Amino acid sequence: MAVSDQSAKGRAFLVVLDSVGIGGAPDADQYFNGDLPDTGSNTFGHIAQACADGLAEEGRSGPLNIPNLAALGMFHAEALANGRSFDGAPATGTWGAAEEVSRGKDTPSGHWELAGLPVPWDWHYFPDETPAFPDEVTKAICEIANVDGILSNSHASGTGVIDEFGAAHMQMGQPICYTSADSVLQIAAHEKTFGLERLLDLCERLAPKLHAMKLGRVIALPSK
């Protein structure tokens, strides 16, 4: 965390190195990537170990060399999170390792809690089946966007769903609506043929209904 001039407005800038975890929480075995539990998750530690083992030699070589983050206490924090001591040089920054109290594995839960706002509820997740969305959600999308249907209506990746449904979207004008393992509904549409403002309006008007269901995010994904 970099802190601004406190004599000015007392603001703090919270900089998040996303997806670089330093160790799994005690309940990691309750969360999965496919069929694999998150037990033993430690992205940063595994990267450092791969570098030390000579398994990360493309474009670089040797042990992980991150002097600025190391000085701030990155290696100390990783060791603490995994019940080890760190014998390297003392850190010049203030460091620590925190255990999340929010149940969500998603981005908003983690970021909100880092900013001091834990999430004491369970997010809503759409099932990994087709159709993924209940009829009332599909109906709301169609009414707001003034369309007669939606495309995808399933769990999908961003690039794959555009490849699969992009041509049909351009031809039929129906928005591409999909979700993932996160608490999210993503809507992709062409910013000219569908309209950027129309897409943003759709997501903005749809969001209150989905937030009432405890869905974390409604994301607009315009494409060219």
Where on the chain are the PLM-derived regions?
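Extended, H/D-rich, highly charged conserved domains that either
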Residues: 189-192, 196-224
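Eukaryotic N-terminal low-complexity, Ser/Thr- and Lys/Arg-rich leader segments
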Residues: 1-4
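Short, well-ordered beta-to-alpha junction loops that form the rim of enzyme active sites
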Residues: 178-182, 220-223
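Extreme N-terminal starter segment of soluble prokaryotic enzymes
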Residues: 8-13
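Active-site nucleophile/metal-coordination loop of metallo-enzymes that catalyze phosphate/sulfate
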Residues: 21-173, 184-190
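Phosphate-/polyanion-interacting regions in eukaryotic proteins
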Residues: 170, 179-181, 192-196
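Generic enzyme active-site microenvironment
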Residues: 16
